[in-house]
Amino acid sequence: MHVCFHGGGGGGGGRLAKSFNVISDFTKILIGRRGGDHALARRRRMRQCKDAAPAAAAAAVASASAKIAPEEEGEGGGGGKEEEFCDKCCSALSGGGGAEEEAAAEGEREWVAEPEPGVLLTLAPRADGVSNRLRRIRFREEVFDAWAAQCWWADNHDRIAELYCLVKPDDDDDEEEAIAAAEAAMLPATPCQSEAEDDDDDDGAESSSRSPSTSTFSGGPSSGSGGGSTGTLGSPILGLVTAPNTTGGGEHDAVRDQHQPTAATWREWVEEYEPGVFITVGAYPGHRLQLRCVELSREKFGEVKARVWWEENKARLHHLYSF
């Protein structure tokens, strides 16, 4: 018996090959679908980016216009008027501050000189560029007291005026008065003078120019009007001039001579009014005592305390004595 397996074997191989072909085709289809999904996603993202670009551009334009708008509004409200600026500080120049600017410039031109330690001079240059104006004089308290400052200015006034070309203008009365007042305030007052000094002094008009009722304080050393106390430079005496000396010539002397006895009977002496206070008293026989000079000891009184004492006791002394 002859059996042939060729036909049967060939049919099975064809079905197997067909099955492989079907599986291969199905796999290709699946791969193609997956790739298509990725492509669709990419195309979708590209469309979204294209749609968002105009919106972003519009937002940027709106933001830029919002930032520029205030400047444009300011330019429109200015009415086309251009504002001037300073070349040095780039600040706006206004037309209404001419006087203030001039005063500020005058203040900027002032300068301070220190001719000696503790002495400060505030100077302002004049228009000629050579001379200066003296604005202020300041003394340091730790170096000078009131009396030392007065003495320094009295001794160095001419030297300072020559050194810094201080000129007193003739055409400026206000400045002239200010300088004169400053000099009068800084110079020490005239101390008490004795009767012998007044006798030697030929010029009696100067002594009679002071009012009898005026009391001026002398910060310097003084000499008593009688024979009791005489002061030299550095004397521990503070003098108070209460009246002009009656032995010199003047209107006061003429009036006194009409109502009083001869000058030969006039007497003066020194009394100690209280500890550290010496008064020079003068009188005619049988007449009221006249207070000629008040002197205070430097050991007990300083410059300020002496002035305070005089203001507190002036009325009482005026009640006891005639000035």
UniProtKB/Swiss-Prot annotation:
Residues 195-205 have a biased composition (Acidic residues). It comes from Oryza sativa subsp. japonica (Rice). Residues 250-259 have a biased composition (Basic and acidic residues). Belongs to the BRX family. Keywords: Nucleus, Repeat. InterPro entries: Brevis_radix_dom (IPR013591), BRX-like (IPR044532). Residues 109-165, 267-322 form the BRX domain. Residues 206-220 have a biased composition (Low complexity). Pfam families: BRX. Residues 185-259 are annotated as: Disordered. GO terms for cellular component: nucleus. It is found in: Nucleus. This is Putative protein Brevis radix-like 5. It comes from the Eukaryota. Transmembrane segments: none annotated. Residues 221-231 have a biased composition (Gly residues).
